[in-house]
Each structure stands twice: as C-alpha cells, then as structure tokens.
Amino acid sequence: PVQVTKETAGREEVARHSGKRAHFLHGPYPATHFGPKACILPNPTSVMHIQDPASQRLTWNKPPVNVLVIRKIRDESLVEPFKELCRFLVEEKQMMVYVERRVADDATLSKDEAFGSIRNQLCTFREGYDDISDCIDLIICLGGDGTLLYASSLFQGSVPPVMAFHLGSLGFLTPFKFESYKTEVAKVFEGNAAITLRSRLKVKVVKDMLQRTGQQLYESPQQQPEHNGLLPHGHTNSEAGKVTLQLQVLNEVVVDRGPSSYLSNVDLYLDGRLITSVQGDGVIVSTPTGSTAYAAAAGASMIHPNVPAIMVTPICPHSLSFRPIVVPAGVELMITLSPDARNTAWVSFDGRRRQEIQHGDCIKITTSCYPVPSICCHDLVYDWFESLAQCLHWNVRKRQARLADISDSSDTEN
C-alpha cells in the first residue's frame, strides 16, 4: 500500500487548487476478482494488460460451493421456480445455498412438507446484520431488474458473478430464461461464460462540507469566489465534513425537489469546477447500465454497459438548452444545494435510502472499481440489443414499402 504523508497530502491539495486532475479520465481499472473464487480468464493476447471487453470470460480459481439465491419477494408465482432451483442446487450439484431469512420463513415454504428436507439445509442471513460478502461464490437472481439491483446492494465491495433469470415484469438486465436453468447453470459452473462488467458509482454523502460565512452561504453562484472556475482553498474544509453514507450504486443517483413545490436548485461540480446550476425537478447521475432506466425516461441516450462513462441528465429543467451530457468515467462529480435555493433537496440511490440534503451538504460521485460481473446468455453485444428490442421495443415502426411495390399497386388500381 502507498504510504500517505503530510507532504503527499499537501501536493494533492496544491494540485486540486491549481486545476490539475487527480483522477484518471477513463476511470479506475475494474477489479478482476469477483468474490472468493471467481475471476476473469486471463487473455495472453491482450495488449498492455488492457483486455478487450468482448473477450472477457469467467473462470474459477476453485470449484464454486456457496450459491446465493435472491428471489423477488411477495410474488407467489416465483415460489415453485425457487423451490425447483434450490432442489437442483442442493441435491444434484451439492451446493450450499444461501437465502434471506424472510424467504426461508415464508409461510408457503413452511407448509410444503416435500420441500422440508431442502429447506432445512438452506443457510439464511439478514440484510444489514449478517455479512456474507466473503463466502458467496455465485449469485442467482429470480425476478426482474429490481432483484439484480437489490443483489448489488448487498455487496459494497467485490461482487460475485451474477446470473439473472427473467421472471419479473421488464427484465432488461435478466437475459436468461428459466425453462433451461439446469443447462445454463451447469455451463456457468464449468467456467468460460461471457460476462459484462457493469460499472457502479461510488457515492459519498458529506454533511456540512461547505464552509459558511456567518452561517450564510454566498447569495448566488456568481458571487462564489473562484480561481479559474475552481473552488478556492478555504471554501471547502475536509475536516469539517462528515461522511454519513457511502454506497455502491448500480443504476443511478437521483437528486430531486422532494415534496416541495419550488424548483430544485443545485450546483454541479466536475473535479472541483462549477459547470452548471440545475434548476428544475432535479438531476440524474447514472451509470451506462442506468442509462436505460430513469435517465432514458428523462430523455437521455442509452449507453452500452462497456462504455466507460457517467451520464448526467436533468429532470424537467427550466431551460430549453439543458441537454443530457456524458462525461468520462474517471471524473468526480459533486452536487451541492445552491446558496440561493429556496428549499432543500432529496437524494436516493437506486431508488433506496432516500434522504434530505441541506445547505452545506454535498454528494460526491465517481466510478467505483467494483463492478457487477453480469453473466451473459449469449454475448455482451447480442444481449444488450436483444434487451433493447424485446423490453424497450427500440426503433419499432411499420416497415416502409419498396417503391416498386407502391408503383405496382397504383398501376393495378388504375
């Protein structure tokens, strides 16, 4: 590990205020080990240790043993597929199956005497109480996209490979069909499955980060003292800020006006430089994976998950020229409440942990080095365009007829 001294910390502080970037624009190189036993299959033909995403394959250092099965809660139609999968993993594959305690305690499972022997062998855990991050080799999701998002939230560091079966409503992130689950799961256990590394956002919520003058912030962004557009030394205080929340986010961070009737008014900084103020219903900061979710509904472009980028999308901005933008994955974004904002703002992370943002608070966002290794059904290009076509009906319209066909029909009518 690199030893951080007062001298190196001072150089970083000088670099920040001199306008020099402290982040690599392409973002951090993603971790290539997923959980205790999975990793990317090394490619000897890769140049400069940068592997082509299309050639990324899953391999196992040791045979997988512990499988986490995540099931969509309160959906009775998933009870039978869940029992069938657990029976297959325990009896035929001799796996240790982990499930949430609330799933194992479900009344439907408790009443099934035929499933009792399997149920007694399930390992259970409680979200927020039990740490299972170091013992899970593979995650299998039964449900929709929300199930995959929930699975991602359980692992705030390295994420084991995720295999998602489409048993929900939309299924953009769930490429596998459950009808062939035995064959597909067996292939994954053998290794060499194609994977997509879905980047996540590393998010910090810092309370009282911005210094105040007489308990009052500057009246407008134009009055904030800046040096070449950068926040000057003394405007922020690293010792004053307290990190109250740190999360890994797969889809998006949403900052909005909450229950207030006023426009939200937040300032957006990129690597310490104020780039704009957002006046409207709010702003969405999303990963390429999240670009097909809330951001797409707000008018953003859809980005393939292997493109290293961060999408910034305004929500109903009170400006005709405020278009969504794509920034490099390695930058650090910071969102603060504008000094002249009439109300507070609210922030949520993948639709969860919603909380209020006050004057002086800030949200720091950058790309995480811990992606979600999503196992592909076919390959990372085919799966994505298949989801665009099947789930979002991308570019669906009635086909235009050939000119020859039109001429023939008009001649017949005459």
Language model segments and positions:
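Short glycine/serine/threonine-rich phosphate/pyrophosphate-binding segments
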Residues: 78-79, 146-152, 291-297
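Gly/Ser/Thr-rich active-site loops/lids in small-molecule metabolic enzymes
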Residues: 273-321
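Short gly/pro/ser/thr-enriched loop/turn and capping motifs at secondary-structure boundaries
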Residues: 105-106, 168-173, 301-303, 318-320
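Short, acidic/small-residue loops that bind anionic groups at enzyme active sites
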Residues: 155-177
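Short glycine-rich anion-binding loops that position phosphate/pyrophosphate groups of nucleotides
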Residues: 73-74, 145-147, 170, 289-291
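Feature detects long, helix-prone N-terminal segments enriched in hydrophobes
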Residues: 135-139, 145-155, 159, 267, ...
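N-terminal low-complexity/intrinsically disordered extensions
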Residues: 1-138, 179-250, 255-261, 267-277, ...
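Compact, glycine-rich, soluble single-domain proteins
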Residues: 68, 142, 314-315
